[in-house]
């Protein structure tokens, strides 16, 4: 047990019970955002397709314990929570890899101001754990050069307009033939679509998207 866990015992992000960052009961309560055997059709509520984005799926429904855990990861200065969350999502991530083949994992970037405020980029933390668990490479190829307004009140078209020009390739970055862009929450897929557009413009031929949870 780590010293920090002795001095400050962790509590479950889902139910608040002390002993772990995410207890077994809450992890077991995570509801899949798609059928166990993922069928990659547009009618599937867990699957999204777009102009630049070939395909995107989410592991879980954004509800109950999943919502609490992702909100704590994003706003509660709990970087360690990325590990159990990403590990829980590995089966869904592996199902996407069966379709995508060998790819580079690319996290959705946050603006430098937001990164300083939180101390980390939650999408990058999740992407590293997913990539390590699946045995595929990860690289922060994208940067967020422009801060954007809050998007929760915008529809998909509004979000795409809001994100126009927000993402760029990092200096010297060379996109691979295929990539998976990773984010924490999938709502309209506008963020994944915007990132995919930059990667495609940079030479990437196929871009997939993966999120821990989807609002349904």
Each model region followed by its residue ranges:
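Glycine-rich phosphate/pyrophosphate-handling loop used in enzymes and phosphotransfer proteins
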Residues: 1-216
